[in-house]
Amino acid sequence: MNHRVQPIIAVLIALGAFGFLYVLVTNPGEMAKMAVTVIVAGIIIYFIVKYVMNRNAGSEGAAFKKAAKQSRRRMKEQKAKHRAGHKGRVSHLRSVPSASKPKPMILKKKSQTQLTVIEGKKNKKKNRALF
């Protein structure tokens, strides 16, 4: 990318670097104090923003958390069923002759996916002239 730095931005960066070096050389204690102040202010702002964002999420955030929890629980149950069905099986890498007759194939029932109905404009007629 050939983006050219604006002259005003370059001057501000140069002045900031010069001021940083000047304070670092002349008064390093004050520099450390300013750094701690900036870090503490940043942490306070971060937690305020995080708190406000969590409050604004409201019912949508709660619904999402509930759906995620249900999904995790359902996946654990499916994995437990899957593992229980495969415990007695022999790996496909080993060839073990079977003494008994082969078992009939069991058809696995597909699990229903959880779908959400989105309400919309169902009665609106399509303009067939555009097709």
From Swiss-Prot:
Keywords for the protein's UniProt record, in alphabetical order: Cell membrane, Membrane, Transmembrane, Transmembrane helix
Membrane topology: Multi-pass membrane protein
InterPro entries, per the entry: SA1362/YqhP-like
Span list, region Disordered: 62-131
Subcellular locations according to the entry: Cell membrane
An example Gene Ontology CC term for this record: plasma membrane
Transmembrane regions listed in the UniProt entry: 5-25, 34-54
Ranges of Basic residues composition bias in the record: 66-92, 122-131
Keyword Cell membrane: yes
The name this protein goes by in its record: Uncharacterized protein YqhP
Biological source species: Bacillus subtilis (strain 168)
